[in-house]
């Protein structure tokens, strides 16, 4: 279970980006975080694994308080949080298998990593996961030879190779075409259920969020102002979350669906 309590993030002397935010996520739940640009969605995800340092508050994952960990302790604890990025964050010149095995770097020796002598169990699990997401036949292909959707599937498998206790996805479909975006969202939803893995997604496309999520969290100016099932996200709720956003921009992210 992830439990966030009174989480605040402030840059310098400006207004807080996150304002005493409280959120609990558990089980095989896919939670989509929506809101206009600047609402604090990406900052929230990055504060969870301390890619961004919280100013105050608590982030607890299955009994471990992340905000008080030392740098050394944090390096180890981050293995428990999988992360999927909008820009894929793959090494183009490496193969799919080599990129996937990057998810195990915190678990194997430096020598094994440098010589790419991966443990047999890791190779077996990598093939199982790649088969599950439909990229096993690309195992020996360079990452820069893949399409955007294929690259994002590599990113998902890399994160799952950590055997994480929670998966965070920061705008995982933002650079993909509509059909591929739906495939990735469907994949993340199915994996959450199959692996009993909580998944939190920062997403702009509200139509996809409503279709594939178990829960939607709406943010505005660093606060959570909506937290409920997709069916409860009415037009009035959308007007509150996206107040001030031009109608044409809402349409682009599916905010009127």
Curated annotation (Swiss-Prot):
Protein name: Phosphonates import ATP-binding protein PhnC 1
Assigned GO CC terms: plasma membrane
Record flagged with keyword Mitochondrion: no
Family the UniProt entry places it in: Belongs to the ABC transporter superfamily. Phosphonates importer (TC 3.A.1.9.1) family.
Stored SUPFAM superfamilies: P-loop containing nucleoside triphosphate hydrolases
Cell compartment(s), UniProt: Cell inner membrane
Keywords assigned: ATP-binding, Cell inner membrane, Cell membrane, Membrane, Nucleotide-binding, Phosphonate transport, Plasmid, Translocase, Transport
Subunit architecture: The complex is composed of two ATP-binding proteins (PhnC), two transmembrane proteins (PhnE) and a solute-binding protein (PhnD).
Lineage: Bacteria, Pseudomonadati, Pseudomonadota, Alphaproteobacteria, Rhodobacterales
